[in-house]
Amino acid sequence: MSSSKSLDWADDEDYGTGLPSIQTFDNPDGTKTMIEFRIDDNGKKVKVTRVIRKTVITERVQHAVAERKKWKKFGKEAGKNSGVDARTTSVGENVQLRLQLGWTTTKEEEQDEAALAAAKVKAKGSSVVRCRACKGNHFTAQCPYKSIIGPVDEPPLDASPVSSRASGALGEKGRYIAPHLRAGSGRESGDSMFKRERDDSATLRVTNLSDDTREEELRDLFRRFGGIQRVYLAKDKETGRAKGFAFVSYYDRDCAIKARDRLDGYGWNNLILRCEFSKPRD
């Protein structure tokens, strides 16, 4: 009389026949088809077919950035492959820092706002407090991120300098009032703006630029001759690509002359640059 051997729950099961190996085929359209057989959770043999398409994404970066990526790693990272290692480096989003001048909040305003918020909560009969800036469980006046998020429900104030001798320069709560908005000024908004001419004596007009030129590249090219005040690259509104010309303003005219003499006729991005001083407007 033959007796069957009882199986333990930890013993490997023998299915009798092995699974076929993974098969890979190249398709005419450039994709790959991968066929795999495996056992699912219910113990049944299933066939899995995958179609893989390889996509190459080309990113245009500055030459200096590409050279930095070729640097050899040192220290504890010495000998490892180039690029970002996900085990030691976390890549986050770029945080845009917004600096705003002329906005101040007095202690009296903070106390008034906190008292008003407490009164609203008490009137509703609830102890839930929510910040209007970051939506946290605290008063808006006590928000720790208030300096980062900025003022809530308040328009930005003019950042013009305040003169202590000017009568009417400070309004209620010590806030600055523009000259044309003061009582009895009799001036229209922006009348002095159009009468003031801009000094373009240190501004260069750069032409014959490629359509893929970026403002950072122009700034890196011209900053070696002196301090740059402003860089304007003309772009198409629909495509966002450069129109082929730009304006570079220096703080000093001597720096602009030096840049014009060195870069006029200079080969850059497979094109010959043309640099000349900007002509004043009529």
Curated annotation (Swiss-Prot):
Keywords: Cytoplasm, Initiation factor, Phosphoprotein, Protein biosynthesis, RNA-binding. GO terms for molecular function: RNA binding; translation initiation factor activity. GO terms for biological process: formation of cytoplasmic translation initiation complex. The keyword RNA-binding applies. Its main location: cytoplasm. The modification Phosphoserine is found at S160, S164. The keyword Protein biosynthesis applies. It is found in: Cytoplasm. It comes from the Eukaryota. Residues 202-280 form the RRM domain. Belongs to the eIF-3 subunit G family. Component of the eukaryotic translation initiation factor 3 (eIF-3) complex. The eIF-3 complex appears to include tif32/eif3a, SPAC25G10.08/eif3b, tif33/eif3c, SPBC4C3.07/eif3f, tif35/eif3g and sum1/eif3i. This set of common subunits may also associate exclusively with either moe1/eif3d and int6/eif3e, or with SPAC821.05/eif3h and SPAC1751.03/eif3m. The eIF-3 complex may also include SPAC3A12.13c/eif3j. PANTHER family: EUKARYOTIC TRANSLATION INITIATION FACTOR 3 SUBUNIT G (PTHR10352). This is Eukaryotic translation initiation factor 3 subunit G. The lineage of its organism: Eukaryota, Fungi, Dikarya, Ascomycota, Taphrinomycotina.
